[in-house]
Amino acid sequence: MYGRSVQDCAYTASIGMIAQGQNDFAANGRIWLGLLAPHDRGRGLGLGCECLRPIKMSAVEQKPSEQPAPTTVAPDTVSTPEPAVAAAADNATAAPAPSETPATPAAPAAPDASGAQDTPATAGADSEVPAPTETKELVETKEPAEKKEPAETKEAPVEKAPVDDKTPITQLWATAKATGHPEIWGVTLADPETHVPTRIILQKYLNANDADLDKAKDQLTKTLEWRAKTKPLELVKKAFSKTKFDGLGYVTKYVQDGSTEPEAKEVFTWNIYGGVKSIDETFGKLEEFLDWRVALMELALQELDLASATKLITAEYDPYKIFQVHDYKSISFLRQSPQVKSASAETIKVFAQNYPELLKEKFFVNVPAIMGFVYAFMKLFVAPKTIKKFHPMSNGGSLAVEFADSKVAALGEKLPANYGGKGAELEEQGKGPLLE
């Protein structure tokens, strides 16, 4: 009898799976395990000089009167580019030959001692100034031209540009475009380089798969295909049976006045499974139940309003998530129908695949304390980061105290009275899928 009761308890706890199937929940494939447990947070120009040296040597061997010739050549060497300098030097070397012929008549002046003494001095001065000095200037004028080389290195960054097209985000964007469906969670997808909401969504798929790009691509593709087929945004406009779903699900939003920070807004989804009047009616038609549950989630995403998000997320920082509360008051954990089991399994599959990284924390309230052993058993198999998001509580009235650290002032007090707050009842402050 006890063995049978434990099994029934485990089956019954799987109702929690219906509430929200996140990628986190898929860690162990059994979200029901998180229902029951104690609370746990947890980079020389030698040519010019060599060309001018023959000019200097010729000037010394010539007579003083012939020295102006090099002087005429030197300026040309300074003002001409490298090829012209070589030509000027060749012309200058040939010039002294004709100038030596008129120099012979001028020989009588040579015996003049003073003239002979002045000539070396003059020659020395002329040879020192034009040749060395002009040569140095030539070298200096060519140095700037060589400095053009660094300009070529500036093209390096341009060569790296194509690499940016291979980042995980841009590859996911290419995958999304190839799929054809343009929307996820109410956001019309656009270039993530300029569209923050799209970048947030693509980053969530990377985060959900621990940065494994191939897995993220696969999940993103399946989500887009599922949304194209299911049309979740249309389900929000669809009216469901009041007899089957009245009072079973609500969405509430709490915002800190005067703040536009994403942390200053909290969105909740509430699943009141204790309000189920007929298991056969509510869970009998699986497709209908899933449509209703998806509509509730899409309403919460509308309140989260990712389309207006302006703050990028990372693997560690992501304020765009939702609180979930599942209330099991008045539910018997010793009985479970095939319909509920089927609904639980399919809901987990659909939500884990199509709504990753949207769960902030999940509270299971009014769960019998006797089922705490299931939570202890679950810790052996579920990843710690997932366990930290599950908070089973036997008393729903103590839920309000869990939000003392929220950026929304006095958030706990805004909750309904039966959850420890001072706010209006869910029927008044919350909204759910359309009913008729």
Swiss-Prot record:
**From what superkingdom does this record's organism come?**
Eukaryota
An example Gene Ontology biological process? regulation of exocytosis
Q: Keyword Cell division: yes or no?
A: no
Primary residence = cytoplasm
Q: Which Gene3D superfamilies match?
A: CRAL-TRIO lipid binding domain (3.40.525.10)
Keyword Cytoplasm listed: yes
Q: From the Swiss-Prot or TrEMBL record, state where the protein is found.
A: Cytoplasm; Endoplasmic reticulum membrane; Microsome membrane
Q: Which PANTHER family match?
A: PHOSPHATIDYLINOSITOL TRANSFER PROTEIN SFH5 (PTHR47669:SF1)
What name is this protein filed under?
Phosphatidylinositol transfer protein SFH5
- Tell me what organism the protein belongs to: Chaetomium globosum (strain ATCC 6205 / CBS 148.51 / DSM 1962 / NBRC 6347 / NRRL 1970)
